[in-house]
């Protein structure tokens, strides 16, 4: 996808962030800080097919990231 291409270029994916209602989000992708970008980035895939960047510092987004991390760490 477009995100993978940007990561290969070794720069941040998100140039700006957008505030959006959580109900419009289909999928969240958290990109950890690394050599390509010094900050954590959150890319949301919306139900209408668009991809936008969310502010990882926003309280609602922090909660969502926490949920993702917790669910990812659980053994099934």
Swiss-Prot record:
GO terms for biological process: immune response; inflammatory response; positive regulation of neutrophil chemotaxis; positive regulation of release of sequestered calcium ion into cytosol. Signal peptide: none annotated. Alveolar macrophages. Disulfide bonds join 12-37, 14-53. InterPro entries: Chemokine_b/g/d, Chemokine_CXC, Chemokine_CXC_CS, Chemokine_IL8-like_dom, CXC_Chemokine_domain, Interleukin_8-like_sf. One of its GO terms (molecular function) is chemokine activity. The keyword Disulfide bond applies. This is Alveolar macrophage chemotactic factor. It is found in: Secreted. One of its GO terms (cellular component) is extracellular space. The keyword Disulfide bond applies. PANTHER family: C-X-C MOTIF CHEMOKINE 6 (PTHR12015:SF201), SMALL INDUCIBLE CYTOKINE A (PTHR12015). Has chemotactic activity for neutrophils. Belongs to the intercrine alpha (chemokine CxC) family. Keywords: Chemotaxis, Cytokine, Disulfide bond, Inflammatory response, Secreted.
């Amino acid at each position: 996808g477009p995100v993978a291409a940007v990561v290969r270029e070794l720069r941040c994916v998100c140039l700006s962030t957008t505030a959006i209602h959580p109900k419009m989000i289909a999928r969240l992708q958290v990109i950890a800080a690394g050599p390509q970008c010094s900050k954590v980035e959150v890319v949301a895939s919306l139900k209408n097919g668009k991809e936008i960047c969310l502010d990882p510092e926003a309280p609602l987004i922090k909660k969502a990231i926490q949920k993702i991390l917790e669910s990812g760490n659980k053994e099934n």
